Regions:
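Surface-exposed extracytoplasmic segments
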Residues: 8-454
Length: 454
Protein backbone atom coordinates (compact mmCIF):
# COMPACT_ATOMS: atom_id res chain seq x y z
CA UNK A 1 0.00 0.00 0.00
CA UNK A 2 1.16 3.54 -0.69
CA UNK A 3 0.10 4.97 2.64
CA UNK A 4 2.58 3.52 5.13
CA UNK A 5 4.46 6.22 7.01
CA UNK A 6 1.96 7.55 9.56
CA UNK A 7 3.17 8.10 13.11
CA UNK A 8 0.83 7.46 16.01
CA UNK A 9 1.07 7.62 19.79
CA UNK A 10 1.50 4.10 21.12
CA UNK A 11 -0.96 4.41 23.99
CA UNK A 12 -1.14 8.01 25.15
CA UNK A 13 -4.69 8.86 26.31
CA UNK A 14 -5.95 6.00 24.16
CA UNK A 15 -9.33 5.29 25.81
CA UNK A 16 -12.08 7.69 26.94
CA UNK A 17 -12.08 6.69 30.60
CA UNK A 18 -8.32 6.75 31.11
CA UNK A 19 -8.10 10.37 29.98
CA UNK A 20 -9.68 11.26 33.34
CA UNK A 21 -6.94 9.48 35.29
CA UNK A 22 -3.54 10.28 33.74
CA UNK A 23 -1.61 8.96 36.75
CA UNK A 24 -2.69 5.42 35.84
CA UNK A 25 -2.49 5.81 32.06
CA UNK A 26 0.13 3.45 30.63
CA UNK A 27 1.77 5.05 27.59
CA UNK A 28 4.21 2.39 26.38
CA UNK A 29 5.48 -1.02 27.40
CA UNK A 30 8.85 -2.58 26.60
CA UNK A 31 10.31 -6.05 27.09
CA UNK A 32 13.72 -6.98 25.73
CA UNK A 33 16.82 -9.02 26.39
CA UNK A 34 19.13 -6.63 28.22
CA UNK A 35 21.82 -5.20 25.97
CA UNK A 36 23.78 -3.21 28.55
CA UNK A 37 27.35 -4.53 28.79
CA UNK A 38 27.66 -7.27 31.39
CA UNK A 39 23.91 -7.99 31.56
CA UNK A 40 23.71 -11.05 29.32
CA UNK A 41 20.98 -13.42 30.46
CA UNK A 42 18.76 -10.67 31.85
CA UNK A 43 15.39 -9.42 30.62
CA UNK A 44 14.27 -5.81 31.06
CA UNK A 45 10.64 -4.72 31.39
CA UNK A 46 9.70 -1.03 31.26
CA UNK A 47 6.17 0.24 31.84
CA UNK A 48 5.75 3.95 31.16
CA UNK A 49 2.94 5.92 32.79
CA UNK A 50 1.55 9.49 32.96
CA UNK A 51 1.66 10.74 29.35
CA UNK A 52 2.65 14.12 27.95
CA UNK A 53 4.54 15.41 30.99
CA UNK A 54 5.82 18.92 30.39
CA UNK A 55 9.27 19.72 31.72
CA UNK A 56 7.73 22.86 33.24
CA UNK A 57 4.95 20.91 35.00
CA UNK A 58 5.43 22.52 38.41
CA UNK A 59 4.83 23.17 41.15
CA UNK A 60 3.48 19.66 41.74
CA UNK A 61 4.97 17.78 38.77
CA UNK A 62 3.94 14.15 38.29
CA UNK A 63 3.53 11.87 41.28
CA UNK A 64 2.22 8.33 41.04
CA UNK A 65 -1.21 7.51 42.46
CA UNK A 66 -0.89 6.12 46.02
CA UNK A 67 -4.26 4.37 45.67
CA UNK A 68 -3.22 2.44 42.57
CA UNK A 69 -1.65 -0.94 41.99
CA UNK A 70 0.78 -0.79 39.05
CA UNK A 71 1.83 -4.21 37.75
CA UNK A 72 4.06 -5.91 35.19
CA UNK A 73 2.75 -9.39 34.31
CA UNK A 74 4.64 -12.29 32.73
CA UNK A 75 3.10 -15.38 31.11
CA UNK A 76 5.81 -18.04 30.81
CA UNK A 77 3.80 -20.93 29.33
CA UNK A 78 1.43 -19.42 26.77
CA UNK A 79 -1.92 -19.94 28.50
CA UNK A 80 -2.69 -16.18 28.52
CA UNK A 81 -2.59 -16.12 32.32
CA UNK A 82 0.14 -14.42 34.35
CA UNK A 83 2.66 -16.71 36.06
CA UNK A 84 4.69 -13.93 37.69
CA UNK A 85 3.69 -10.33 38.43
CA UNK A 86 5.64 -7.46 39.92
CA UNK A 87 3.32 -5.01 41.71
CA UNK A 88 4.25 -1.43 42.65
CA UNK A 89 2.43 0.52 45.38
CA UNK A 90 3.41 4.13 46.07
CA UNK A 91 3.43 6.31 49.16
CA UNK A 92 3.74 10.10 48.96
CA UNK A 93 5.26 11.99 51.89
CA UNK A 94 6.03 15.56 52.86
CA UNK A 95 9.12 16.48 54.84
CA UNK A 96 8.93 17.16 58.58
CA UNK A 97 6.82 14.13 59.46
CA UNK A 98 4.44 14.72 56.56
CA UNK A 99 3.71 18.29 57.66
CA UNK A 100 5.94 19.98 55.08
CA UNK A 101 8.87 22.34 55.50
CA UNK A 102 8.00 25.59 57.30
CA UNK A 103 10.07 28.78 57.39
CA UNK A 104 10.12 31.48 60.09
CA UNK A 105 8.30 34.47 58.64
CA UNK A 106 8.12 37.92 60.23
CA UNK A 107 10.21 39.96 62.67
CA UNK A 108 11.11 38.83 66.15
CA UNK A 109 8.07 39.10 68.38
CA UNK A 110 5.69 38.66 65.44
CA UNK A 111 7.11 35.58 63.83
CA UNK A 112 5.19 32.61 62.50
CA UNK A 113 6.30 29.28 61.05
CA UNK A 114 4.67 29.09 57.61
CA UNK A 115 4.78 26.10 55.28
CA UNK A 116 6.37 26.58 51.86
CA UNK A 117 4.38 26.01 48.64
CA UNK A 118 7.09 24.18 46.66
CA UNK A 119 8.42 20.63 46.51
CA UNK A 120 11.95 21.81 47.30
CA UNK A 121 13.57 24.82 48.93
CA UNK A 122 17.09 24.46 47.55
CA UNK A 123 19.46 22.43 45.45
CA UNK A 124 19.24 18.64 45.35
CA UNK A 125 21.94 16.16 44.39
CA UNK A 126 22.86 12.51 44.73
CA UNK A 127 24.77 13.45 47.87
CA UNK A 128 22.26 15.78 49.52
CA UNK A 129 18.47 15.80 49.16
CA UNK A 130 17.71 17.57 52.44
CA UNK A 131 16.08 20.47 50.57
CA UNK A 132 13.35 18.19 49.22
CA UNK A 133 9.90 18.90 50.64
CA UNK A 134 8.27 15.90 48.95
CA UNK A 135 9.25 12.29 48.40
CA UNK A 136 7.82 9.14 46.88
CA UNK A 137 8.50 5.62 48.10
CA UNK A 138 7.16 2.35 46.83
CA UNK A 139 6.81 -1.25 47.82
CA UNK A 140 7.48 -4.04 45.34
CA UNK A 141 5.58 -7.31 45.60
CA UNK A 142 6.06 -10.43 43.51
CA UNK A 143 2.93 -12.49 42.89
CA UNK A 144 3.54 -16.09 41.80
CA UNK A 145 0.56 -17.39 39.86
CA UNK A 146 -2.81 -15.74 39.39
CA UNK A 147 -2.76 -12.04 40.26
CA UNK A 148 -5.74 -12.37 42.59
CA UNK A 149 -4.98 -15.65 44.35
CA UNK A 150 -1.26 -16.27 43.84
CA UNK A 151 1.45 -16.35 46.49
CA UNK A 152 2.63 -12.84 47.38
CA UNK A 153 6.22 -12.08 48.38
CA UNK A 154 7.37 -8.66 49.53
CA UNK A 155 10.66 -7.74 47.86
CA UNK A 156 13.15 -5.42 49.53
CA UNK A 157 16.26 -3.61 48.32
CA UNK A 158 19.62 -5.19 49.09
CA UNK A 159 20.47 -2.01 51.02
CA UNK A 160 17.71 -0.28 52.99
CA UNK A 161 14.12 -1.24 53.61
CA UNK A 162 12.19 0.86 51.09
CA UNK A 163 12.45 1.68 47.41
CA UNK A 164 12.43 5.39 46.58
CA UNK A 165 11.66 7.41 43.45
CA UNK A 166 13.74 10.46 42.49
CA UNK A 167 12.09 13.85 42.22
CA UNK A 168 11.09 14.79 38.71
CA UNK A 169 13.52 16.97 36.77
CA UNK A 170 12.62 20.42 38.13
CA UNK A 171 15.44 22.30 36.39
CA UNK A 172 19.11 23.22 36.48
CA UNK A 173 18.89 25.57 39.46
CA UNK A 174 17.66 22.62 41.50
CA UNK A 175 19.88 19.91 40.00
CA UNK A 176 22.80 22.00 38.58
CA UNK A 177 22.75 20.25 35.18
CA UNK A 178 21.21 17.38 33.27
CA UNK A 179 24.36 15.37 33.94
CA UNK A 180 24.02 15.91 37.68
CA UNK A 181 20.35 14.94 37.52
CA UNK A 182 21.37 11.73 35.76
CA UNK A 183 23.82 11.00 38.59
CA UNK A 184 21.09 11.77 41.14
CA UNK A 185 18.57 9.50 39.39
CA UNK A 186 21.09 6.65 39.10
CA UNK A 187 21.29 6.55 42.88
CA UNK A 188 17.70 5.26 42.84
CA UNK A 189 18.58 2.04 40.98
CA UNK A 190 18.13 -0.79 43.47
CA UNK A 191 19.20 -4.42 43.50
CA UNK A 192 16.90 -6.97 45.09
CA UNK A 193 16.69 -10.71 45.52
CA UNK A 194 13.98 -12.90 44.01
CA UNK A 195 13.17 -16.03 46.04
CA UNK A 196 14.52 -19.14 44.34
CA UNK A 197 16.61 -17.10 41.92
CA UNK A 198 20.40 -17.28 42.10
CA UNK A 199 21.15 -13.82 40.69
CA UNK A 200 19.99 -10.39 41.83
CA UNK A 201 17.40 -8.33 39.97
CA UNK A 202 17.25 -4.53 39.61
CA UNK A 203 14.49 -1.93 39.72
CA UNK A 204 14.18 1.77 38.93
CA UNK A 205 11.18 4.10 38.95
CA UNK A 206 11.54 7.67 37.77
CA UNK A 207 10.91 10.34 35.17
CA UNK A 208 12.45 9.75 31.75
CA UNK A 209 12.20 11.42 28.36
CA UNK A 210 9.41 9.84 26.35
CA UNK A 211 11.22 7.72 23.73
CA UNK A 212 8.17 7.46 21.49
CA UNK A 213 8.09 9.64 18.36
CA UNK A 214 4.79 11.01 17.06
CA UNK A 215 3.30 13.87 15.08
CA UNK A 216 0.48 13.87 17.59
CA UNK A 217 -1.64 16.89 16.69
CA UNK A 218 -1.73 16.50 12.92
CA UNK A 219 -2.09 12.74 13.07
CA UNK A 220 -5.37 12.82 14.95
CA UNK A 221 -6.60 15.66 12.75
CA UNK A 222 -7.45 12.97 10.18
CA UNK A 223 -3.73 12.58 9.32
CA UNK A 224 -3.28 16.20 8.26
CA UNK A 225 -0.12 15.62 6.21
CA UNK A 226 0.96 13.38 3.34
CA UNK A 227 1.71 10.13 5.21
CA UNK A 228 4.23 8.77 2.73
CA UNK A 229 8.02 9.13 2.87
CA UNK A 230 9.04 12.32 1.05
CA UNK A 231 12.71 11.32 0.69
CA UNK A 232 14.17 8.43 -1.27
CA UNK A 233 14.89 6.83 2.11
CA UNK A 234 14.11 7.91 5.68
CA UNK A 235 16.49 10.71 6.62
CA UNK A 236 18.02 11.05 3.14
CA UNK A 237 16.99 14.70 2.90
CA UNK A 238 16.82 14.62 -0.91
CA UNK A 239 13.08 15.17 -1.41
CA UNK A 240 13.01 12.41 -4.00
CA UNK A 241 10.30 10.29 -2.43
CA UNK A 242 6.53 10.71 -2.74
CA UNK A 243 5.66 14.26 -3.89
CA UNK A 244 4.90 16.39 -0.83
CA UNK A 245 5.42 13.45 1.51
CA UNK A 246 6.42 13.86 5.13
CA UNK A 247 10.13 13.59 5.92
CA UNK A 248 12.05 12.53 9.01
CA UNK A 249 12.50 15.60 11.20
CA UNK A 250 12.43 16.44 14.89
CA UNK A 251 9.98 19.18 13.92
CA UNK A 252 7.41 16.42 13.40
CA UNK A 253 7.84 14.98 16.89
CA UNK A 254 5.28 16.46 19.27
CA UNK A 255 6.76 14.37 22.10
CA UNK A 256 10.27 15.74 21.69
CA UNK A 257 10.12 17.69 24.97
CA UNK A 258 7.69 15.41 26.82
CA UNK A 259 8.45 13.03 29.68
CA UNK A 260 6.93 9.90 31.18
CA UNK A 261 7.40 8.00 34.42
CA UNK A 262 9.12 4.64 33.91
CA UNK A 263 8.63 1.57 36.08
CA UNK A 264 11.60 -0.64 35.18
CA UNK A 265 12.47 -4.14 36.33
CA UNK A 266 15.45 -6.18 35.14
CA UNK A 267 15.41 -9.86 36.10
CA UNK A 268 17.42 -12.97 35.21
CA UNK A 269 15.64 -14.63 32.29
CA UNK A 270 15.75 -18.02 34.00
CA UNK A 271 13.58 -16.63 36.80
CA UNK A 272 10.64 -15.84 34.52
CA UNK A 273 10.73 -18.44 31.74
CA UNK A 274 9.35 -21.29 33.84
CA UNK A 275 8.92 -24.60 32.00
CA UNK A 276 8.05 -23.02 28.66
CA UNK A 277 10.14 -22.79 25.50
CA UNK A 278 11.94 -19.60 26.53
CA UNK A 279 9.34 -17.31 24.97
CA UNK A 280 7.46 -15.14 27.45
CA UNK A 281 4.46 -12.88 27.07
CA UNK A 282 4.15 -9.72 29.14
CA UNK A 283 1.97 -6.68 29.69
CA UNK A 284 1.36 -3.93 32.23
CA UNK A 285 -1.80 -2.94 34.09
CA UNK A 286 -2.91 -0.32 36.57
CA UNK A 287 -5.81 -0.84 38.95
CA UNK A 288 -7.79 1.41 41.29
CA UNK A 289 -10.23 0.72 44.14
CA UNK A 290 -13.82 0.48 42.93
CA UNK A 291 -15.09 3.32 45.13
CA UNK A 292 -13.68 6.72 46.03
CA UNK A 293 -15.34 9.21 48.38
CA UNK A 294 -13.98 12.74 48.27
CA UNK A 295 -13.03 14.31 51.57
CA UNK A 296 -14.92 17.64 51.93
CA UNK A 297 -12.08 18.78 54.19
CA UNK A 298 -9.30 17.43 52.00
CA UNK A 299 -5.73 17.27 53.29
CA UNK A 300 -2.48 16.17 51.69
CA UNK A 301 -2.62 12.92 53.65
CA UNK A 302 -6.32 12.25 53.04
CA UNK A 303 -7.84 13.96 49.98
CA UNK A 304 -10.30 11.07 49.67
CA UNK A 305 -11.20 7.65 51.02
CA UNK A 306 -11.08 4.65 48.70
CA UNK A 307 -12.31 1.11 49.10
CA UNK A 308 -13.66 -1.96 47.36
CA UNK A 309 -12.02 -4.46 45.06
CA UNK A 310 -9.09 -3.34 42.95
CA UNK A 311 -10.36 -2.78 39.41
CA UNK A 312 -8.17 -2.74 36.32
CA UNK A 313 -8.42 0.56 34.43
CA UNK A 314 -5.36 0.46 32.18
CA UNK A 315 -3.67 -2.26 30.15
CA UNK A 316 -0.88 -2.29 27.60
CA UNK A 317 1.12 -5.03 25.91
CA UNK A 318 1.90 -4.65 22.22
CA UNK A 319 1.96 -1.06 20.98
CA UNK A 320 -0.81 0.53 18.93
CA UNK A 321 -3.50 -2.08 19.62
CA UNK A 322 -5.93 -0.10 21.78
CA UNK A 323 -4.87 3.12 20.08
CA UNK A 324 -5.50 2.12 16.47
CA UNK A 325 -7.17 -1.29 16.32
CA UNK A 326 -9.91 -1.37 18.96
CA UNK A 327 -13.09 0.64 18.22
CA UNK A 328 -13.71 3.67 20.40
CA UNK A 329 -16.77 2.10 22.03
CA UNK A 330 -14.72 -0.88 23.23
CA UNK A 331 -11.50 0.86 24.23
CA UNK A 332 -12.42 1.03 27.92
CA UNK A 333 -13.53 -2.60 27.78
CA UNK A 334 -10.12 -3.55 26.41
CA UNK A 335 -8.40 -1.51 29.12
CA UNK A 336 -10.17 -3.55 31.80
CA UNK A 337 -9.98 -6.96 30.07
CA UNK A 338 -7.61 -9.84 30.80
CA UNK A 339 -5.66 -11.39 27.90
CA UNK A 340 -7.51 -14.67 28.42
CA UNK A 341 -10.72 -12.85 27.42
CA UNK A 342 -9.40 -11.31 24.20
CA UNK A 343 -11.58 -13.44 21.95
CA UNK A 344 -14.21 -10.71 22.23
CA UNK A 345 -11.93 -8.36 20.26
CA UNK A 346 -11.03 -10.77 17.44
CA UNK A 347 -12.96 -8.93 14.70
CA UNK A 348 -10.92 -5.79 15.28
CA UNK A 349 -7.76 -7.73 14.41
CA UNK A 350 -9.04 -9.91 11.58
CA UNK A 351 -10.97 -7.02 9.96
CA UNK A 352 -9.30 -3.76 11.10
CA UNK A 353 -10.96 -0.47 10.22
CA UNK A 354 -7.92 1.84 10.17
CA UNK A 355 -6.60 0.77 6.72
CA UNK A 356 -10.02 1.46 5.19
CA UNK A 357 -10.18 4.84 6.93
CA UNK A 358 -6.80 5.76 5.46
CA UNK A 359 -8.02 4.54 2.08
CA UNK A 360 -11.03 6.86 2.30
CA UNK A 361 -8.82 9.79 3.30
CA UNK A 362 -6.06 9.35 0.72
CA UNK A 363 -7.02 7.17 -2.25
CA UNK A 364 -8.29 9.99 -4.47
CA UNK A 365 -5.33 12.24 -3.60
CA UNK A 366 -2.84 9.46 -4.36
CA UNK A 367 -4.46 8.67 -7.70
CA UNK A 368 -4.52 12.37 -8.63
CA UNK A 369 -0.88 12.89 -7.66
CA UNK A 370 0.43 9.78 -9.39
CA UNK A 371 -1.98 9.78 -12.33
CA UNK A 372 -3.07 6.27 -11.43
CA UNK A 373 -6.36 4.47 -10.89
CA UNK A 374 -5.59 2.41 -7.79
CA UNK A 375 -8.77 0.69 -6.65
CA UNK A 376 -7.83 0.59 -2.97
CA UNK A 377 -4.83 1.47 -0.82
CA UNK A 378 -5.97 -0.90 1.93
CA UNK A 379 -4.95 -4.56 2.18
CA UNK A 380 -7.56 -7.03 0.93
CA UNK A 381 -6.32 -10.23 2.58
CA UNK A 382 -9.20 -11.00 4.94
CA UNK A 383 -9.19 -12.30 7.56
CA UNK A 384 -5.91 -10.57 8.47
CA UNK A 385 -4.06 -13.63 9.70
CA UNK A 386 -0.84 -11.60 9.48
CA UNK A 387 -2.13 -9.27 12.20
CA UNK A 388 -3.34 -12.22 14.26
CA UNK A 389 0.22 -13.57 14.18
CA UNK A 390 1.79 -10.19 14.97
CA UNK A 391 -0.45 -9.27 17.89
CA UNK A 392 -2.18 -12.41 19.18
CA UNK A 393 -0.04 -15.53 18.67
CA UNK A 394 3.54 -14.58 17.87
CA UNK A 395 5.63 -15.68 14.90
CA UNK A 396 6.57 -19.39 14.70
CA UNK A 397 10.29 -19.83 15.26
CA UNK A 398 10.69 -16.28 16.55
CA UNK A 399 8.40 -15.40 19.46
CA UNK A 400 5.61 -17.97 19.55
CA UNK A 401 5.16 -19.81 22.82
CA UNK A 402 4.96 -23.61 23.07
CA UNK A 403 1.28 -23.31 23.96
CA UNK A 404 -0.53 -20.90 21.66
CA UNK A 405 -3.48 -19.06 23.19
CA UNK A 406 -4.53 -16.11 21.01
CA UNK A 407 -4.24 -13.08 23.28
CA UNK A 408 -2.78 -9.61 23.11
CA UNK A 409 0.57 -9.28 24.86
CA UNK A 410 4.18 -8.45 24.04
CA UNK A 411 6.04 -11.69 23.29
CA UNK A 412 9.81 -12.07 23.70
CA UNK A 413 12.11 -14.97 22.89
CA UNK A 414 14.66 -14.87 25.71
CA UNK A 415 16.89 -17.29 23.79
CA UNK A 416 17.69 -14.81 21.02
CA UNK A 417 20.84 -12.90 22.00
CA UNK A 418 20.52 -9.17 22.56
CA UNK A 419 21.90 -6.89 19.87
CA UNK A 420 24.36 -4.25 21.17
CA UNK A 421 22.87 -0.75 21.17
CA UNK A 422 25.17 0.54 18.44
CA UNK A 423 24.21 -2.33 16.10
CA UNK A 424 20.45 -2.31 16.57
CA UNK A 425 18.09 -1.76 13.67
CA UNK A 426 15.14 0.51 14.44
CA UNK A 427 13.09 -1.80 12.22
CA UNK A 428 13.70 -4.82 14.45
CA UNK A 429 12.97 -8.18 12.83
CA UNK A 430 12.04 -6.41 9.57
CA UNK A 431 15.56 -4.94 9.59
CA UNK A 432 17.20 -8.37 10.14
CA UNK A 433 17.60 -7.67 13.85
CA UNK A 434 15.83 -10.59 15.53
CA UNK A 435 16.26 -9.04 18.99
CA UNK A 436 13.82 -6.21 18.16
CA UNK A 437 10.09 -5.70 17.67
CA UNK A 438 7.88 -7.67 17.30
CA UNK A 439 10.21 -9.98 19.24
CA UNK A 440 9.68 -7.92 22.36
CA UNK A 441 10.21 -4.20 22.06
CA UNK A 442 13.15 -1.89 22.79
CA UNK A 443 12.90 1.87 23.36
CA UNK A 444 14.55 2.57 20.00
CA UNK A 445 12.36 0.28 17.89
CA UNK A 446 10.31 2.15 15.27
CA UNK A 447 7.13 0.25 16.03
CA UNK A 448 4.93 2.47 13.87
CA UNK A 449 6.76 1.79 10.62
CA UNK A 450 7.13 -1.89 11.54
CA UNK A 451 3.46 -2.37 12.41
CA UNK A 452 2.22 -0.52 9.34
CA UNK A 453 4.27 -2.83 7.14
CA UNK A 454 2.76 -6.02 8.60
Amino acid sequence: AAVTACAFASSHREAPNITRAPAVDSTDFYAFNSYEEGRDGYVTFIANYIPLQDAYGGPNYFAMDPNAHYAIHIDSDGDAVEDVSFVFNFTNMLAADNEGIALPIGPEGNQKMVKVPLKNIGGISADDSSAANFSEMYSLTMVSGDMQSGERTTLTPSMGDMFKKPLDYIGNKTFTSEAEYARYAESFIYSFAIPGCDDMARVFVGQRKDPFVVNLGKTFDLVNYVPVEGDSAPGAGDGEGFPGGITQSENNDDLLDKNVTSLSVEVPATCVTGDGNGVIGSWTTASLPQATILNPDATFAKPSVSGGAMTQVSRLGSPLVNELVIGIGDKDTFSSAHPSDDGQFADYVTHPSLPELLNILFKDAVNTTLGTDIETLAPTNFPRTDLVTAFLTGFPGVNQQATVTPSEMLRLNTGIPATPAESQSAFGVAGDDLAGFPNGRRPGDDVVDIALRV
